[in-house]
Amino acid sequence: MRVTLLGTGDTTGTPTVGCACATCEAARERGVSRSRFSVHVANERTGESLLVDFSPDFRRQFLDHDVALPDAGLVTHIHFDHLDGLGNVYRLVDGLPVHAPSETDPATNESVAETIRRKYDYLGDRISVQAREPFAPFETCGLRVQFVPVDHPPLRCFGLVVVNPETGAKLSLTGDTSYDI
């Protein structure tokens, strides 16, 4: 499993436009610029890859890191900085499986999977949304994956456990969570 952190910045990127906090000032002084959260996971055994979350910086991230377009996507929650890059797949993929949690969020009365289907219906069969139960492992790209609930109010948010069943290598990550995991 080869993991590429495409973006690790804040919701608005780091540094944030117009922000004078210590983090943003230090980033400017050091010439550091971080795009929003997204992770590329390549299964070197199968040659397939998956993308964790679709940052609005999708295009720039893929150009900067020279990684393959994903064979599948995973969406952890519906905040714009984790989902709104999904529209970038238009003309790039066909039938991309996009796995998302099926648990209904009381704040929205929809699951992440339902929100993607509604919000990105214009993508037609460019994507295929796959609703997944939290804690229920599933296979994609030759990897075993499961969504795990994490605390990130006010919306339901999920972390991931990704396991290479052949080697036992394990990746656990969450894009957003509070300190109370």
Across the structure, where does each feature detected by a protein language model lie?
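Binuclear metal-dependent hydrolase catalytic cores
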Residues: 1-180
